[in-house]
Regions:
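Short functional hotspots at interaction and active-site rims
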Residues: 1-274
Length: 274
């Protein structure tokens, strides 16, 4: 310490003389190839592979730091394996090829999702060693179906049905809620489901001057309203409404927060011009 004080005028530690080289640097390409062929390996599994296959002992933090420095993050989006079936793949390719020619202001994407009076966030925080317990209804709750359309500039024709969706309920929605909002030349896209094909649905849409097209099977990624539902359900879990009336009011409030720019972003993300 006396020598440091004499030399620098300070008793602080001397600055480092250089940057230590990571032992993973020599295995860089191997690490890239590993996650390219097995992308869902955990840090612990990669660490174990290094030890067995490369005789290299490192900590999981070192493995994380290596991939983080090379902008390789841990993530995964799940798509239906059925998308690889020849008939489904052909239908998806045809729909994607058509996307650029569609006029976004004329498009209306319809879908429905279930909502309940027992929705709650699935995770939270508490001290280590303690359990985080949340109370939700287990014996009595209500399940409803929220159905709506998405246009380039906002939500349209929102409606809540008591219980699950069936053919007669969907037909009533189309005739009484959706059809009055349609204009000449509109194209209504919806999932290729039996309940969406009951007698009267296509006729009601056609009578309003619009046409109906069904999305390819196993293709939620081609329906931009799916992203709205993800946001909606996250907000519903946050507020955790416990009565039917409170849930209705909350859905109505959340619909108003979906801005036009946000809708356009959803269209673009699904591959449509906006």
């Amino acid at each position: 310490m006396d020598q440091t004080l004499d030399a620098t005028g300070s008793i602080g530690a001397l600055p480092g003389t250089g940057h230590s080289r990571s032992p993973l640097k020599a295995r860089e390409q191997w690490l890239f190839d590993l996650v390219a062929t097995e992308p869902d390996l955990t840090l612990a599994e990669i660490r174990a592979r290094l030890r067995v296959e490369k005789k290299l002992k490192v900590g999981t933090t070192s493995v994380w730091r290596f991939y983080n420095c090379h902008e390789t993050t841990f993530k995964k989006t799940l798509h239906a394996a059925e998308q690889d079936r020849p008939d489904v793949a052909a239908a998806r390719a045809a729909r994607k090829a058509e996307q650029a020619s569609l006029k976004a202001p004329r498009l209306v994407f319809i879908d429905e999702t279930s909502v309940t009076t027992k929705m709650v966030r699935h995770y939270g925080r508490c001290p280590v060693g303690e359990r985080l317990v949340a109370k939700v209804p287990h014996g009595h709750w209500k399940t409803m179906t929220f159905i709506a359309g998405l246009r380039i500039d906002g939500m349209t024709a929102p409606y809540v049905i008591d219980g699950s969706m069936d053919g007669p309920s969907f037909l009533a929605y189309v005739e009484q809620v959706l059809a009055p909002t349609l204009h000449d030349g509109d194209i209504v896209f919806m999932d290729n489901l039996r309940t969406h094909k009951v007698d009267g649905v296509a006729a009601a849409i056609k009578a309003a001057g619009a046409s109906v097209r069904y999305l390819p099977a196993y293709s939620p990624d081609l329906n931009p309203i799916e992203m709205v539902f993800v946001k909606l359900k996250a907000a519903l879990r946050k507020d955790a409404a416990r009565t039917v009336e409170a849930l209705w009011k909350l859905i109505g409030k959340l619909i108003k927060t979906i801005a036009p720019d946000e809708c356009a972003n959803y269209f673009r993300h699904a591959g449509y011009k906006a």
